[in-house]
């Protein structure tokens, strides 16, 4: 009797698993769409292909609701596939444009760093910036826009650090020189007044 109960329980569990397997929620598609969505938002590409982004967001939101409510996995999968395709379109259209803008911005920042001679004062950050710039140019040459954008964002970060570190040191030096000049003038005045 015990054996029959055990086999019946296993059989029911097996039937339940088989019946549910055909209608499982599309978690892989959800993960893929979420990854593409996160990239789009991280790089702030929403406005480069607004229509596609809106389509992606609408489909993604509707699919998320279906998944949360554990309803209609087939429709959720279709919505997530549509969302992923739209997010990919936004990335494909937006990343090259964003990379071009960043390249222009980093050219200005590189010039500022060179003018202030950051390569002498903050050599580490300056060299990291230049290395990332070369990597960005290489990535642009192979149309790897995501890598180019990441490198160009690093260029901005490192050149900014190098520039402001150098500026701070120059400002401190200028202040010290001004104070020294004031002290020298004060001493000269004292010497003149004492020699009379």
Locations of regions flagged by a protein language model:
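Bacterial N-terminal signal peptides that target proteins for export
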Residues: 1-8
